[in-house]
């Protein structure tokens, strides 16, 4: 049975699934309020070092750069509508291939063209991040975001990080105004 996390909680993926080599991170959401405008949310991953900054601009994985330089992190494609049940976007991570100088994978979701469309996370419900053992399909951990983020246009859902020889999953749920640009700047992306 999957571990259910609350904001700030963490779990050792290594202890919960000792034989897992490849993790699948699923991110999902539903739009609850819309004025008819298209609603496009995008998942992205920042591969950061000890200083909390990306190792290079190519260590930012998203719909226009779907694979990390080491090949370990692969975005599975952009879902432009968020329709349907289950994961809206997925990222596959080969934990055995993540470069040693990458200390943390930060998973974020942003609203595309949020300002011009007057959209924010207050219009989004049922958001979640889950980690699945890709080798056997079993869900290891899940974080259901519950806070109302009525002004934020970007959200860090969670992180996979190294702790000694272990990989851990931390539930973050931190919102940001300023969308993708604000998140990218915070993580050292040159925009």
Swiss-Prot record:
Compositional bias ranges of the Basic and acidic residues kind: 77-88
UniProt cross-references to InterPro entries, sorted A to Z: Stress/Tellurium_Resist, TerD
Xref: CDD domains: TerD_like (cd06974)
Keywords: Plasmid, Tellurium resistance
Region (Disordered): 69-88
GO biological process annotation, one example: response to tellurium ion
Family matches, as Pfam families: TerD
Function: Not known; seems to contribute to the tellurium resistance (Ter) mechanism.
Family: Belongs to the CAPAB/TerDEXZ family.
The protein's name in its UniProt record: Tellurium resistance protein TerE
Organism this protein belongs to: Alcaligenes sp
């Amino acid at each position: 049975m999957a571990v259910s996390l609350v904001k700030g909680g963490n779990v050792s993926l290594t202890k919960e699934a000792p034989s897992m080599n490849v993790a699948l991170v699923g991110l999902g959401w539903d739009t609850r309020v819309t004025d008819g405008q298209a609603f496009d949310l995008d998942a992205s991953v920042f591969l950061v070092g000890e200083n909390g900054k990306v190792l290079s601009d190519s260590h930012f994985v998203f719909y226009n750069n779907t694979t990390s330089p080491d090949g370990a992190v692969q975005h599975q494609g952009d879902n432009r509508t968020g329709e349907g049940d289950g994961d809206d976007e997925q990222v596959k991570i080969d934990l055995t291939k993540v470069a040693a100088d990458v200390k943390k994978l930060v998973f974020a979701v942003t609203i595309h063209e949020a300002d011009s469309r007057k959209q924010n996370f207050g219009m989004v419900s049922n958001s979640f991040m889950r980690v699945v053992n890709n080798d056997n399909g079993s869900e290891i951990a899940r974080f259901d975001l519950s806070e109302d983020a009525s002004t934020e246009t970007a959200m860090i859902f969670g992180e996979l990080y190294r702790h000694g020889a272990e990989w851990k999953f931390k539930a973050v749920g931190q919102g940001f105004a300023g969308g993708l640009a604000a998140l990218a700047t915070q993580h050292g992306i040159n925009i």
